[in-house]
């Protein structure tokens, strides 16, 4: 994984990424471009792309995508966390969370990653489901318990996380989903 540029701090984003066709991929591209415009060169965004199966081959932008993992193989998550822990240039890990992106039941393959990860982590929940069954509640609560901070897109999502999942409201920030500017 190429995260060794001298005197560079990295925010590593664990997400799908273009050219994979996925709304979260587009969102991650937009947010990393905005962060890089604002903070580069002192902090740079890099992606670890989630591939949906072992035969997925995407022609990723090598300047942005530092690595990729098979989202349906739990060992990749653990190995990635260990690798990130060893890299002093990685300052924070941002996880773009959508249940369908991560392997396992309700995307629970992300949990071993978070259990091994020693870096601060920010998790953006793109979907927050109300009235969870016990399994879903356990997965989301465990993910939240390992995060340094959570981000949701609206106040209803924050309310659901607080009431239905008993997640502390002080770790949840609301950042409304924006729309990138398009030249006409």
Q: What do these predicted ranges mean?
A:
Residues 68-69, 82-107, 120-124:
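Short N-terminal targeting/anchoring amphipathic segment
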Residues 122, 146-155:
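A short beta-strand/loop micro-motif in the catalytic core of glycosyltransferases
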Residues 54-77, 96-103:
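Acidic/glycine-enriched edge-of-secondary-structure segments
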Residues 156, 178:
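Carbohydrate-associated surface elements
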Residues 115, 129-148:
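A conserved, positively charged/aromatic
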Residues 101-102, 130, 159:
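Short glycine-rich, flexible loops that bind phosphorylated cofactors or substrates
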Residues 1-67, 88, 149:
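N-terminal subdomain of nucleotide-sugar transferases
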